[in-house]
């Protein structure tokens, strides 16, 4: 132990470097346990590996013995986007307007109608497609990842729902739009030729919904109570599909009132049912059966019922066909 050695920012310090090594201040080396440690730009050998100081990049979770020099990318890439190009292949889903990104992991995506903009921090994937004109530069197309843990509609698609009722060029009435997470993806699906009428009662998420709609011209935000559709009847024409995620005890009545006013004959009704919001005293299956019967009484013929497990607990999605002339046997 060299207590008599000169000390300072440029010199060597042996005392605390101990166990056979020496420690430099901002540019020296520390021999602790067989390795060397640089200050702001050096290497640290501690337990057999090397570590860049403030001048190096930090790698992933690579263990104590291995090098830690890789770029830091969080869990699955930077938040703003996902790696695309040649490593990701976009395939059309069986539901028109929905796509699957095949890569390291398969992702549900929609084509971004407002490129460069994300709504809730979702990943974006840019793909270059060859131009149809000979000699022209390839076209860059952006897709947004549709998270089934953030969207009941995406959870239904992942669960294998047969009929969606939402496709390019369609007009959709969305009840319970909240801040516009799912609405933005529905807007991507229907495309510039379609239209989404998004109804939300709460003003706080309604402000975010309006902000999202400013960048998507095919979204019309309506901040009003879906229990009184006559208040906004002058804003909405006839629609091809109604999607409802209102989570209210009287949601069947809310859906029926809006369907009677705005939904075309043979139009599609898609409902997300949360059992606890309707009746928490009975099991979920009983609640679902009661709601389906209420829909039958309102001339909505159920076509399929699908649980949203594992994405949502005690939730199901029901798809029905609206018959204006009366429910056919």
Curated annotation (Swiss-Prot):
**Which GO biological process entries does UniProt record here?**
box C/D sno(s)RNA 3'-end processing; regulation of transcription by RNA polymerase I; snoRNA guided rRNA 2'-O-methylation
Q: Could you tell me the keywords of this UniProt record?
A: Methylation, Methyltransferase, Nucleus, Ribonucleoprotein, RNA-binding, rRNA processing, S-adenosyl-L-methionine, Transferase
Under the cellular component aspect of Gene Ontology, which terms does the record hold? Answer: box C/D methylation guide snoRNP complex; nucleolus; small-subunit processome
Record text on subunit structure and interactions = Component of box C/D small nucleolar ribonucleoprotein (snoRNP) particles that contain SNU13, NOP1, SIK1/NOP56 and NOP58, plus a guide RNA.
* Family per record: Belongs to the methyltransferase superfamily. Fibrillarin family.
| First-listed, main subcellular location of the protein, grouped into a coarse class | nucleus
UniProt catalytic activity? L-glutaminyl-[histone H2A] + S-adenosyl-L-methionine = N(5)-methyl-L-glutaminyl-[histone H2A] + S-adenosyl-L-homocysteine + H(+)
**Record flagged with keyword Secreted:** no
Name listed for the protein in its UniProt record: rRNA 2'-O-methyltransferase fibrillarin
One Gene Ontology MF term? RNA binding
- For bias type Gly residues, the affected ranges are 13-84
Kindly indicate whether the keyword Methyltransferase belongs to this entry: yes
- Description of post-translational modifications: By homology to other fibrillarins, some or all of the N-terminal domain arginines are modified to asymmetric dimethylarginine (DMA).
Known role = S-adenosyl-L-methionine-dependent methyltransferase that has the ability to methylate both RNAs and proteins. Involved in pre-rRNA processing. Utilizes the methyl donor S-adenosyl-L-methionine to catalyze the site-specific 2'-hydroxyl methylation of ribose moieties in pre-ribosomal RNA. Site specificity is provided by a guide RNA that base pairs with the substrate. Methylation occurs at a characteristic distance from the sequence involved in base pairing with the guide RNA.
